[in-house]
Amino acid sequence: MKILTAFFILFFSCSFAQRSAETQPPPQARLVKSVDHLTLEAALELAKNSTEKAAQLNKQVSLAVLDTAGNVILLMRGDGVGIHNTEAARRKAYTAVSTKTATLTLLRNARANPDTNNLNTLPELLLLSGGVPVWYRGNVIGSLGVAGGGSPENDDAIARAAAIPEKGILTSK
């Protein structure tokens, strides 16, 4: 009887240990994460959607698409657009990816709250309308910035028009 009891204890202990090992993630999963990245192909499609919206508004714009680290994937300037708008578009995109917030929303929130009014003093952040984070499956995978649309509302509308909803790439959460 003692042998039978010992056998059952050993058998169930081994099977429990084996199951728990199978359900635990590998140790490297705590050290490395897989993430989705915005591709050049997607950046070109985002830019195409934005420039089509700009054309509907009879505007030429500068446009920047960045990855989540703030690196430029695509930078373009429409015909006749002032050269300062290219840097403004990049900084708007940087602000959007850094804060995971559309720059128009960030601008309005900063103006409404004296505690955040000094956000515009941080290097690289530009609290002007026209920057949006780019979302995929609930995560920011990059950003897009637009400058030269003629008004804050135009820059924001042109940036938001970049979305590729049929592929799950969005400009709002």
Please tell me what each predicted stretch does.
Residues 1-4:
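Positively charged n-region of N-terminal signal peptides that target proteins for export
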Residues 9-17:
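Hydrophobic h-region of N-terminal signal peptides that target proteins for export
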Residues 18-173:
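Flexible, solvent-exposed loop/hinge segments and secondary-structure transition points
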